[in-house]
Amino acid sequence: MARLAPIVPSWPDLPANIGALASTRESGVSAAPYDDGQGGGGLNLGLHCGDEAAQVHENRALLAALLPGRPAWLAQVHGVAVVDAATVQPGQAVQVADASIASTPGVVCAVMTADCLPVLFADLDGKVVGAAHAGWRGLAAGVLAETVKAMRAAGAGEITAWMGPAIGPTKFEVGPDVRDAFVCCALQGEDDALRTAFKPCPGRDGKFMADIFALARLFLARDGVTRVFGGTHCTATDSARFYSYRRDNVTGRLASLIWIK
């Protein structure tokens, strides 16, 4: 088995005392359709997507070897709830939330995705970190704003963010319901940004190609988070590295994680 080689964010603003990474589908033990797409074992980290639990736990152990502590896994529901990752303990019921924050060294915030957008946060003083699962429903409902709010309540100063692997703008076809969910909550002066984020799909009336990275930048800017990086990895087009629900339907889950060292 090859050694894990997760994505280390290209994140110039990340304080030196903060660690962060995003997993790929490579170098795990899961069999098809949760494999690495090349005939080898896949690093599926989701217990809820049909894979053998023993394989998922082994994959999680492989990932844990790179971390200072156990990831605070959540039961994600496309909502806006944010929890303190330090309260997520083994042996307890999994907490229902789509984001977590941490201000204690060694506590690992984690979100799982397979096309939805993972966003990692850190304040520039390295005192508070966070991770959010932002599918279009959670994004429109305000999960990023709630995460920023929770971080500031925990003492964060200026916040920087990194957008991890998600479905890119050439693959994310949506209907008018998705576009309307964002248009209805648009603020004055955001019309141009929304037009850029929802481009009509040629030859498919009523369909749009959505840019979830652009939408996240728009929502983050509302809360004063303008130091935003990432948004360069498309899960749907890079089958060698990423799981994608839109592409494969039955598939594994990736993780994006952040912690204070």
Each model region followed by its residue ranges:
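Active-site microenvironment for binding and transforming phosphate-containing groups
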Residues: M1-K261
